[in-house]
Amino acid sequence: MGNEASYPAEMCSHFDNDEIKRLGRRFKKLDLDKSGSLSVEEFMSLPELRHNPLVRRVIDVFDTDGDGEVDFKEFILGTSQFSVKGDEEQKLRFAFSIYDMDKDGYISNGELFQVLKMMVGNNLTDWQLQQLVDKTIIILDKDGDGKISFEEFSAVVRDLEIHKKLVLIV
């Protein structure tokens, strides 16, 4: 490969070498302070994310080591979930992880409230939003434990074909 960087196999699961190189160039452009990782502010410089109310949650999900920034490996692994070659299960798990803020494998009433609050802002009162959250939990919670498991989440979301919309063209 000469002077070109090689990447661990687990980083390349859904991208070919040309796509990795393009993502590498994009990462370098985004890394304004040349630190080797992307801060929230650097992520926000992406026009397609600037006005996304869930951008901080996306960054939290990408940031697998929890240091508050996204390094190149985390960037590749995170964006890989949006690859057209990515599978339905992986995309559903990513969508679930946006809501599962404490990473315990369940979406609690409080987590659903927080994420929906990010999306609706002040368009609903907290009382209205809580009513929506409570109804959603009642409908999706098939085993009656008061929270939504991945299986309960995916049973509903799979039918909406969300995985077909979670695509990034590299």
UniProtKB/Swiss-Prot annotation:
SUPFAM superfamilies: EF-hand
Keywords from the named record: Calcium, Lipoprotein, Metal-binding, Mitochondrion, Myristate, Repeat
Residues carrying the site annotation Interaction with PxVP motif in substrates of the catalytic subunit: 118, 122
Binding-site residues, Ca(2+) 2: 63, 65, 67, 69, 74
Entries under PROSITE patterns matching the protein: EF_HAND_1, EF_HAND_2
Region of interest (Calcineurin A binding), ranges: 131-136
One Pfam match: EF-hand_7
Domain EF-hand: 18-46, 50-85, 87-122, 128-163
Tissue-by-tissue expression: Testis-specific.
InterPro entries: EF-hand-dom_pair, EF_Hand_1_Ca_BS, EF_hand_dom
Binding locations of Ca(2+) 1: 31, 33, 35, 37, 42
Stated role: Regulatory subunit of calcineurin, a calcium-dependent, calmodulin stimulated protein phosphatase. Confers calcium sensitivity.
Family label: Belongs to the calcineurin regulatory subunit family.
Remarks, miscellaneous: This protein has four functional calcium-binding sites.
Protein's UniProt name: Calcineurin subunit B type 2
Organism: Homo sapiens
